[in-house]
Regions:
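Positions that flank functional sites
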Residues: 34, 41, 57
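Non-catalytic interaction surface on structured domains
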Residues: 18, 42-43, 67-69
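Nucleotide phosphate-binding site architecture
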Residues: 10, 32, 61
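Rhodanese-like catalytic fold shared by cysteine-dependent sulfurtransferases
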Residues: 43-44, 80
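Thiol-based oxidoreductase modules, predominantly thioredoxin-like and allied folds used
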Residues: 23-38, 47
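Structural micro-motif
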Residues: 45-55
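Non-catalytic, surface beta->alpha helical segment in thiol-disulfide oxidoreductase systems
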Residues: 55-83
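Local sequence-structure signature of Cys/Sec-based thiol-disulfide redox active-site neighborhoods
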Residues: 1-25
Length: 83
């Protein structure tokens, strides 16, 4: 799994914390430091919005303005049973 993020993004930190807490391995890609990665996000999503997760080739934004981190969707997409 890849996580497209920036260092200054609070929502990116929350998404990575969720993954860490559930033992999900990922590769972080900083779109501020990698112009090709930034262009990749733009190509797939239509705008430079982070965080973006790529799970088995599928792009997913785990955050929505006004809703915060989409925990239910994360549990489902990652196959994590909810307590």
């Amino acid at each position: 799994m890849q996580v497209y993020a920036t260092r200054w993004c609070r929502d990116c930190r929350a998404a990575k914390q969720f993954l860490d807490e559930h033992g999900i391995e990922y590769t972080e890609i900083d779109v501020d430091r990698d112009a090709a990665a930034s262009a990749e996000v733009l190509r797939h999503v239509g705008k430079r919005a982070v965080p973006q997760l790529v799970i088995d080739g599928e792009w997913f934004q785990p955050y929505k303005p006004g809703r915060g981190l989409l925990y239910d969707e994360l549990y489902q997409k990652l196959g994590i049973p909810q307590a």
